[in-house]
Every structure is written in structure tokens, then in C-alpha cells.
């Protein structure tokens, strides 16, 4: 029999404690059911801000755990970003960082060049995905290359499926293909509510760059 007093006689503080206790028990049961321990595939997509930012946050977390990490940026190649400046200054064998893109396709206006850059980026990414030394791999803006068909989805799905069992992979970019979403463990879709750019505010260092 519960030692809790009837709810109608509880004080607001007692009701709050009861609600929090029920919530804790529910969360504890969910945690107890999660017994599988393996690498996960995370996909960040959508038209909102935060896809790459989330990926780089997980990169920082992984480095903090002492993981061997690899980054391949498929698009962002013609302008400097704060994340690249920060992570490149880490003088550690923990991190391999590659910026392979030549900018967005409307900047190059050269499809053959864009395809070549994407294929070169994918070659490095595929090596990382096959290498058990890498605990965490971030493939930033790979979805853009998939949407443009500069990299073939079948290649990516095969490499992800065959990767070392404890390797975590994060893929970012809008327009994630359905086939990638289907095999991912965690998928987050960022949605725009408001964006400063629409009000004429240019991209800001520390926020977008």
C-alpha cells in the first residue's frame, strides 16, 4: 500500500514531488530497457538552422571522451568557419579534418567540378567508415551531395551498413533521402520558425559561420 496521502489532501509541493517521482520511474524504466550497445547512425536534416551545429557539438563531445574522430565537409569550402578554425587548432592525433567542397553549387556553376569535389570527399569518407580506428565520423552536408546525385545513395548505404560495429556516424544536410532516413537510428528534422536572414541580417560569425 502506498504511503502517499490522498491527492485531494496533498499540498502543491507534495503533488509536484509525486508527479516528478512518476516521471522519474517512467524514465528509469525506459533506460533499463535500452540494453543494446553499438554505434549509431544520426541524420540531421530539414530546412532549419542547427544541422551542422548539432553535428559539431557531438564531435566536441566525442573528442572529450577521447574518441578518434573524422570530419569530412562536402560543401563548405570557399569560406572560413568558426568550427573549422577551432577544431583545426587541436594538435592531437584524435581528429582528422577535411574540407573538400568548393562552395555551394550556385557559386561554382560548374557541375563537373562539383561532382569531382564530392567524389573526392566521398573517397575520404568511405575510408573512414571502413576504418575501425575511427570512433566517430561526421559527414557534414553529405545530404546535399546525395540530393544532387554527386554521390550515390547506394554507396553510402553500403558503407554505413558495413562500418565497424561501434562506430558512430552523423550525416547532415537538408533533403535527407528516404533510404537514408529508413536505416538511421536517430533522425532530427530542423524546422525554420524565424530566421534573421529573412529580415536582411547577414550571416554572423559565431552563429552561422
Label the model's feature ranges.
Residues 1-40:
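Extreme N-terminal, non-catalytic leader segments
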Residues 24-27, 118-123, 169-172:
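Short gly/ser/thr-rich secondary-structure transition/capping motifs
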Residues 37, 46-48, 171:
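Short glycine/serine/threonine-biased micro-segments
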Residues 38-39, 66-67, 133-134, 165-166:
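Short coil/turn connectors at secondary-structure junctions
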Residues 41-130:
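Conserved P-loop
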Residues 74, 141-142:
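Generic detector of well-ordered alpha-helical packing
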Amino acid at each position: 500500500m502506498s504511503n502517499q496521502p490522498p491527492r485531494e489532501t496533498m499540498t502543491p509541493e507534495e503533488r509536484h514531488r509525486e508527479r516528478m517521482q512518476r516521471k522519474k520511474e517512467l524514465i528509469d524504466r525506459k533506460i533499463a530497457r535500452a540494453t543494446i550497445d553499438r554505434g549509431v547512425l544520426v541524420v540531421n536534416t530539414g530546412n532549419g538552422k542547427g544541422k551542422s551545429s548539432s553535428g559539431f557539438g557531438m564531435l566536441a563531445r566525442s573528442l572529450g571522451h577521447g574518441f578518434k574522430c573524422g570530419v569530412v565537409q562536402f560543401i563548405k569550402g570557399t569560406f572560413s568557419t568558426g568550427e573549422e578554425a577551432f577544431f583545426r587548432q587541436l594538435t592531437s592525433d584524435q581528429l582528422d579534418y577535411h574540407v573538400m567542397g568548393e562552395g555551394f553549387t550556385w557559386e561554382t556553376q560548374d557541375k563537373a567540378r562539383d561532382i569531382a569535389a564530392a567524389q573526392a570527399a566521398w573517397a575520404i569518407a568511405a575510408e573512414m567508415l571502413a576504418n575501425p580506428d575511427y570512433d566517430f565520423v561526421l559527414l557534414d552536408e553529405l545530404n546535399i551531395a546525395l540530393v544532387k546525385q554527386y554521390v550515390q545513395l547506394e554507396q553510402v548505404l553500403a558503407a554505413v551498413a558495413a562500418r565497424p560495429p561501434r562506430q558512430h556516424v552523423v550525416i547532415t544536410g537538408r533533403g535527407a533521402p528516404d533510404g537514408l532516413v529508413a536505416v538511421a537510428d536517430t533522425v532530427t528534422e530542423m524546422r525554420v520558425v524565424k530566421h534573421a536572414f529573412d529580415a536582411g541580417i547577414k550571416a554572423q560569425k559565431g552563429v552561422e559561420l
